[in-house]
Amino acid sequence: MGELVDNLPEEVLALIFRDLPLRDLAVATRVCRAWAAAAANSTVWSDKSISCDCELEDLLPPYLSSCLDHIHNLRLEYEPSKKPSRGTATELLTALASRAPRLRGLRLECRGEKPLFDAGQDILGAVHAVCGAAHQLRHLDLRHLPYTLDDTLVLKAAAGCPELRSLFLDNHALVNSVQPTSVLKLLEACPHLRALGLHLASMSRAALELLAAPHRSPFALLALRCACPEDARASPLPDEAWATLSCRHPGLEVELELEPVLPDEAVTRILQPAVPVAVLRLNLSGDTVGPVRFATRHYAETLRALEVRASASPELHTALEELAARCAGLREIHCFCVVRPSVLDAFRAHCPRLRSYTLKLKREPHPWRPTLVR
């Protein structure tokens, strides 16, 4: 067996090594010259996931640092509360910025809680540097960063990354500092953008109209998160603008996430009939039955996934049964309260495309796991 491994072609070894964690990859390079050569193969590095769980020198020895040139798509994970982890993440991003022409995709993810009053200036500064240098960047996903994102970042991406296809800024920060004017500049600078994630307050009627312009590339996904005080006060996006956008891009899907900060009147402003809602997440402190019934009336043709976090009630159960009867294309339903058996029966009977559901008939220990439909 040892001889077989020793005689494997470099291309085969590279396919084996590409899924190794970075630290294990560094160990493999010390086995023999053939393994070291395979570990430096571009196949290993083209699409890379890196978890920053130690100092950079232990994670990425100097003799492997040149391999960063091969990275096209990177998923970088770190723990903001651990100094070595965030230091390594910052150094890696800074190193990428200095050799970024090949970078096509960047996704950042935080594990654990961030320290109190941590604004993430080190990480965000490195992201700014990447945006200023990675002129061929296609995909930037910052949904899992816990920091407040602002106009500076959006304008840096607009100026430095004209080839962007997707940009997700709809993170879980408590404050939204991205103004609608910055989003307009981004859309003007990035004509090929196909997917965009924002807080609702960052969106405007002018942005919807620009996305509907004849010269735009097909637009596929708009994810809007409504979770900040700014979102609750945001100007309404008129139904006629949504209708025009849907007509211009028939395949457009909208994801709406409504959080407890929204009063009932704000929810009424946000839920417009012409919005092509494919994913709806309701985690409201007020009325939930009304939005579920609104979705039944207006989103039956487009709704693919519904998530409800609310207290159980006969009215909610009835609304869910009515939705099941109308939304035949539904693929996921997740309700985080105990439901009566007829709710489960309704979704099983009327939704033939259902792939997973969370519909519990009695209380269970958390976290509740979805049931997969085979």
Curated annotation (Swiss-Prot):
The keyword Repeat does not apply. Widely expressed during embryogenesis and in adult tissues. PROSITE patterns: FBOX. It holds the Pfam family F-box-like. Keywords: Ubl conjugation pathway. Residues 2-48 form the F-box domain. Substrate-recognition component of the SCF (SKP1-CUL1-F-box protein)-type E3 ubiquitin ligase complex. Directly interacts with SKP1 and CUL1. This is F-box/LRR-repeat protein 8. It comes from Mus musculus (Mouse).
